[in-house]
Amino acid sequence: MRALRALRPTARQRRASSSFPRLEVAPRAVDGSRAARRLRAAGLSPGVVYGGEAARPRRLVAVCEKALGRELRARRAAVENTVYELNIQGEAGTELVVPRQVQLRAATSDVLSANFLRFSPDLVLRVPLRFVDAGLNQTLRRGAYLHRVRHALGVRCADAASVPEALEVSCAAGGKGHVYHGTDVALPPGVRLATPAHAALALAVVKTK
């Protein structure tokens, strides 16, 4: 229980220098299902920090299940394109990571395990698409609807601060049968497409009587 309390960020840590949300984790030395069960019994979820430069080692960690569960519920689909400042107890400095392979218990949605991929400019992030300006499109206003082909798009970001929460696609133009492509996405500075620019995102469909 003492270790569990220590993994919960203090008020000072929440006000830390970074603008990124912060996660506290503890190093762990033992892997395997028996060790994972012991961690879960203590309110912790096992995880791995990996990726980044080739020379950087894979790290075994444990994270407070309740703290990570709150993040998952608050951010939902956007959690895997949210950059976190990860503090490993007993080590100087922090790492910028994104959650990956989050496994939930089916009955309760408790976090069974979660891995953390180190951020790099080469990392492909799947960012949710947000279709806007439908009210300015005459075809859509007259009863047509958008048939979405993709709900997210792969992008690379120059730095962690430029990772967007969502990508906007304007639907102001386009009539019946119009296809919106990756080229219609408004990319923020420092963000470039990893998905082909010609990839179809949505289709304007007129309802049949």
Give residue ranges: language-model regions.
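Extended basic (Lys/Arg/His-rich) segments that typically form rRNA-contacting surfaces
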Residues: R2-K209
